Amino acid sequence: MKIHKFILIATIIVTLFETTGCTSINNSKKLRDLGLEYQYIEIQKPRINRAHILRADLKNPNIKPSIIVAKDPDGSGPAEAELTNPFELANKNEVLAFINTNPWDSFPNKEGKRNRNWFEGQPVDIDGLAISGGKIRSNTQPRESSIWLNNEGQLILGGKPENEKVQEAMNGFQLITKEGNIIVSPDNSIHPRTAIGTNKNGTLIWLVVVDGRQKGYSEGMNLYELASLMADLGCWNATNMDGGGSSVMGMIGADGKIKLMNSPSDRFLGLKKIRPLPMILSIEKRVN
């Protein structure tokens, strides 16, 4: 696998109760014993960027990935979820970390216009598979950008086999690395990014958020740069998830509460604003 050293300029592995920005992170031996490791990296070229990386070892019997979907506002109606603060979705004692997942869209009004000024409680249509605890919320034909958990506890990037009942599933936009190779080309689409990657057998996963649209702090990546980062981390396969103002990562802090790790690009009156989401991928402590 080619190593793209121009991307990984500086790496900081955060240790017990150190800080990244103003957030105190409990990346202690306790979390490492659960198979979790958080990294914060600063990238200088081709433009300044800050990335947040959580690696989870799914062979560890004490953790599991879970999809958490927001409330369905209309039952059998067209809406599949209502937008909800992701920290509210993650408000469970078992949650250790989370990131955003699927893209979505609002519904058109009588004039055919869609309200994309996202707000909490807004009914939306989730794009792609959304399955939580075996319950299907968004049921579309699995495709290459689908991500699902198989019966052996491995995270698989790609369409699901017909003979396996899937308990957890989500969807991104497209694969960006496949079998260790970058499969996207450089372009000028520079945005905040969220990506999910796995090793060859799906037992190690990387959850990655790259901040963007913040000049001089973190400006964003194109898909080729994101794929290069995922390849450098060791991903065999990686998928580009919803990004932009949706890109968010939360992780348990030293006080046991979930903390915001990154700097989302949405703003309200100049202040950082967390975009409401229809669903998240969480890493949870397994409860026997």
Where are these regions (language model features)?
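Hydrophobic core
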Residues: 12-19
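Bacterial N-terminal signal peptides that target proteins for export
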Residues: 1-8
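Active-site-adjacent helix-turn-beta-strand microarchitecture at beta-sheet edges
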Residues: 104-188
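Extracytoplasmic
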Residues: 49-51, 92-94, 142-144, 171, ...
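Conserved, well-ordered active-site substructure
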Residues: 109-135, 182-200, 204-237, 246-288
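Zymogen propeptides
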Residues: 21-139
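Short, solvent-exposed aromatic-acidic interface loops
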Residues: 68-75, 161-165, 209-215
